Regions:
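Conserved phosphotransfer cores of two-component systems
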Residues: 56-61, 85-92, 113
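Short, glycine/charged-rich "phosphate-handling" switch motifs in NTP-dependent
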Residues: 116
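A short, hydrophobic beta-strand element within the central beta-sheet of small alpha/beta folds
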Residues: 92-102
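Active-site residues of response regulator receiver
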Residues: 68-69, 99
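Non-catalytic signal-transmission and effector/linker regions of two-component phosphorelay proteins
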Residues: 1-11, 16-37, 41-46, 50, ...
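The feature encodes the CheY-like receiver
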Residues: 73, 103
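A Lys-centered signature of the CheY-like receiver
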Residues: 121
Length: 148
């Protein structure tokens, strides 16, 4: 992610510590050196992205890429997706859903709420690691808009 103005920050919302380490390690292996800001629950992530008042003004001017697990301990990833995509300050931030759920209705719901990419976590370690490396290569060439 080669940006002239501000570097893109990757916000990773993933409650499984093993998955979070695997995701970060393989994004790094793909040559992506952007800051990764990890959260293990939706409440802390939304507080960071939307602020304590929920207005989202705290994200204004930032370039954010969000990696979102759907199965979190305190709320669903769908709730987070809906809040971020309906907020004027975060609606343009790309959201990549990374989850174990491969239910076609759930996939459709995520796209309906504005997910940009939906990736099913493979049970097989090597397959999942390879998918994340490929995602990292995608990150290295994509453009991310600045939040309003």
């Amino acid at each position: 992610m080669d940006q002239q103005a501000k570097p893109v920050s990757i916000v990773m919302i993933e409650d499984d510590e093993g998955h979070a380490r695997l995701i970060e390690k393989n994004i790094r292996r793909a040559g992506v050196n952007n800051e990764i800001i990890p959260f293990s629950n939706g409440t802390a992530a939304l507080n960071y992205l939307l602020g304590a008042d929920g207005s989202g003004i705290v994200s204004s001017g930032k370039q954010l890429l969000i990696l979102l697990d759907l199965n979190l301990p305190d709320m669903t990833g769908i709730d987070i997706l809906e809040k971020l995509k309906s907020n004027v300050h975060t609606k343009r931030s790309p959201i990549v859903v990374l989850t174990t759920t491969d239910d076609s209705r759930e996939i459709q719901r995520c796209y309906d709420f504005g997910a940009n990419v939906y990736i099913t976590k493979l049970v097989n370690y090597e397959g999942f690691a390879n998918a994340i490396r490929q995602l990292g290569l995608f990150f290295s060439v994509m453009q991310v808009p600045e939040a309003q």
